[in-house]
């Protein structure tokens, strides 16, 4: 059975069409299904209208006092669900209900445990977003991937509000989300092995206005911090930053000795100092930051035999590849500023900051992926082509 939770707040203008289109999409699956509307005290009669539609559609309505938030609405709705597949979508028609059928088909295929509707894969997109909104969405997505690189991996749209999951993956899992991004909570805590993404185009709002504001943005940041702590990634981040500071020190000291004391040409001294720092960072991360990775995922099956020198060499080469652009930016900034008359160590410090900023803004998931994630579940991600 398929259970779809639809959180609502003042969606009376579109709720009937949403339910009708959702039913049409799910009827094509030839499986029993239910729709659960979770309403946070709408003032426009959304809950009453949804209840009046029960003779037409298999819908139940859960009324909650006050505005308690979208993510907790999903959790409360799932608690009432009878299905072995649990799904969620918005009521405002920005999530095309027809995509529900694609999510169900993806989960009924062998092996998939989570199916995410993605705006950011081939075949997906947004209908009429402004440049500012696109930038804000991409920035929030990238921030999540940087703060939770183990959790999100290669998921293209971890901020998606439309997805489906096997109920069994949530058995015994305590979902305690903050704000409105329930998918982050599910990806961090669900016991799933494989995730599949389905493309969709985020549509225009059918009616009403956006519920997103400053409070929701703050709750999103709090949620990220909580999940980072709960999954061990916050502690790993502290170790990673400490290692990075040690590498910056090695870079600056080596450059000062090589170029300032030994007279090496700057074009030779800067790359040598950066490479020495990278080597130090790799081995410190290997032994301190990501040590737990080698005792879990990396030892599943035949992986255990690779933890020796061959596995170490492979990780080192992947690390060098992941860091090459940040290292190049570091060297370019250092050389350019020094040639313009800025003192060597000041220029080198600016280079370190530039390279570090590049890695944080664009490269953290790639770097952390060198070691994988310390989890007993090996997760895979695949893409469904647009149909």
Where are these regions (language model features)?
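Alpha-helical transmembrane segments of multi-pass integral membrane proteins
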Residues: 71, 141, 184, 243-247, ...
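A conserved acidic beta->alpha catalytic loop
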Residues: 39-48, 93
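Acceptor/aglycone-binding surface of glycosyltransferases and processive sugar-polymer synthases
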Residues: 64-80, 85, 94-180, 205-210, ...
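Donor nucleotide-sugar binding loop of glycosyltransferases
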Residues: 11-14, 42, 96
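Hydrophobic helical membrane-anchoring modules
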Residues: 1, 150-153, 175-252, 285-318, ...
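Conserved donor nucleotide-binding strand/loop of the catalytic core
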Residues: 33-36, 47-80
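Short, well-formed alpha-helical segments that are part of the catalytic scaffolds
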Residues: 11-26
């Amino acid at each position: 059975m398929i259970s779809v939770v639809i959180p609502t707040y003042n969606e009376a203008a579109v709720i009937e069409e949403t339910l009708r289109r959702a039913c049409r999409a799910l009827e094509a699956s030839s499986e029993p299904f239910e729709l659960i509307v979770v309403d946070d005290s709408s003032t426009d009669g959304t809950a009453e209208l949804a209840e009046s539609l029960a003779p037409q559609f298999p819908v139940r309505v859960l009324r909650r006092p006050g505005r308690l938030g979208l993510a907790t609405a999903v959790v409360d709705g799932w608690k009432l669900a009878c299905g072995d597949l649990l799904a969620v979508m918005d009521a405002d028609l920005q999530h095309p209900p027809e995509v529900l059928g694609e999510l169900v088909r993806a989960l009924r295929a062998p092996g998939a445990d989570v199916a995410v509707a993605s705006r950011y894969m081939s075949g997906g997109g947004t209908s009429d977003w402004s440049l500012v909104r696109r930038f804000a969405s991409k920035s929030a997505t990238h921030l999540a991937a940087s703060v939770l690189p183990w959790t999100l991996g290669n998921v293209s749209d971890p901020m998606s509000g439309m997805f489906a999951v096997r109920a069994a993956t949530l058995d015994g899992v305590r979902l305690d989300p903050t704000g409105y991004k329930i998918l982050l909570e599910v990806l961090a805590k669900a016991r799933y092995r494989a995730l599949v993404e389905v493309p969709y185009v985020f549509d225009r709002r059918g009616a009403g206005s956006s519920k997103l504001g400053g409070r929701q943005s703050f709750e999103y940041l709090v949620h990220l911090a909580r999940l980072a702590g709960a999954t061990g990634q916050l502690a790993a981040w502290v170790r990673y930053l400490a290692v990075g500071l040690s590498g910056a020190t090695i870079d600056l000291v080596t450059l000062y000795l090589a170029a300032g004391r030994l007279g090496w040409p700057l074009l030779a001294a800067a790359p040598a100092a950066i490479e020495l720092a990278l080597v130090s960072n790799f081995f410190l991360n290997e032994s301190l930051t990501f040590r737990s990775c080698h005792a879990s995922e990396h030892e599943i099956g035949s992986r255990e035999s690779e933890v020796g020198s061959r596995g170490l060499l492979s990780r080192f080469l992947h690390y060098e590849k992941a860091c090459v652009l940040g290292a190049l930016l570091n060297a370019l900034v250092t050389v350019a500023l020094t040639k313009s008359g800025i003192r060597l160590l000041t220029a080198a410090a600016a280079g370190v900051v530039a390279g570090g900023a590049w890695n944080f803004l664009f490269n953290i998931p790639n770097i952390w992926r060198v070691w994988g994630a310390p989890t007993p579940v090996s997760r895979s991600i695949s893409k469904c082509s647009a149909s």
